[in-house]
């Protein structure tokens, strides 16, 4: 695809170059009348002689312009034929190998472009033959414009446009984008490590470490009594501790320092024992809670199980009795219904019968 885009740009540039090269030549011949010398003529020279000398220069200009138009037409035909041949031959190769296709394109353009220096040489020869006034004008109109239109435009289309899709687009994903993630990842990973080191140096995290160490040593060793107190004090603000120490130092004498140490030693084991007791009590309470939960779950399951067993046993007993006493149950039901329909005669009924008789 890049190769096809470059070919289209080349064809557009050549199409623009041809009319632009022909227009300046026509305008220069129409707009530039025969130049008259600014210096005064000598008295012995006639104006007719000077006009005769200028006429051959005009004829030479026209012949040279025709030759340049022919060369431009030839170069355009050769460029178009070269482009068509390159497209016909290298379409398959460009799809398979775009780099080799770009290299071949550059080679063909380099082979076709060296026609321009010949035009420059012809323009220089023309200036030498025709003289200073006509040579300068002809170079400005024909040589400069033809070089600008053919050489510069073809270079722009071939060099700039053909290299843009290959160089810049191919280099961006490999060079720029591939290096960015690799450079950013280590920076992100290194920053938390540096922050951790700085925090430990400043003394922000030793409080947590002291708490964990104090908790472990309370469970393990009961002799170290001062460290748990320090761990408890570490949670308090540092400013309050400093103010308390200053007040104690001002109010109490120096002799009271050993007494304080003894009091701390006396209070240390008791506080450590109390803390150990609280820890053990909390552990026991947690264990009891676990046991209670487990026992409650097991008892609930067992109670449901026994209830199901009892109900099943009662149902089995009732069904067994009913199966073996079918006749009695049926006779009892039938006799009850008959007794309601047929009654036994009472004594009063018999007495009434006797009276009638």
Curated annotation (Swiss-Prot):
Biased composition (Acidic residues): 247-263
Transmembrane region(s): 304-324
Protein topology in the membrane: Single-pass membrane protein
Bias-annotated ranges (Low complexity): 129-146
Residues in the Cytoplasmic compartment per record: 325-357
Keywords linked to the UniProt accession: Glycoprotein, Golgi apparatus, Membrane, Methylation, Phosphoprotein, Repeat, Signal, Transmembrane, Transmembrane helix
Intervals, Lumenal compartment: 18-303
Region of interest (Disordered), residue spans: 20-101, 113-299
Localisation: Golgi apparatus, trans-Golgi network membrane
Pfam family for this entry, one: KCT2
Annotated effect of mutating residue 350 to A: No effect on neurabin-1 and neurabin-2 binding
Biological processes, Gene Ontology terms: Golgi to endosome transport
Signal peptide limits: 1-17
GO cellular component: cytosol; endosome; glutamatergic synapse; Golgi apparatus; membrane; postsynaptic Golgi apparatus; trans-Golgi network; trans-Golgi network transport vesicle
Compositional bias (Polar residues): 23-33, 73-91, 159-168, 176-191, 269-281
Sequence segments annotated as region (6 X 8 AA tandem repeats of [PT]-[TS]-G-[GVS]-D-[SN]-[DN]-[NK]): 133-180
Glycosylation: residue positions: 25-26, 140, 147
Consequence the record notes for mutating residue 348 to A/D: Abolishes neurabin-1 and neurabin-2 binding
Modified residues annotated as Phosphoserine in this record: 234-235, 271
Main location: Golgi
Residues modified as Dimethylated arginine: 74
Origin superkingdom: Eukaryota
Subunit comment: Interacts with neurabin-1 and neurabin-2. Binds preferentially to the dimeric form of neurabin-1.
Protein name, as recorded: Trans-Golgi network integral membrane protein TGN38
Native organism: Rattus norvegicus
Name of the gene encoding the protein in the UniProt record: Ttgn1
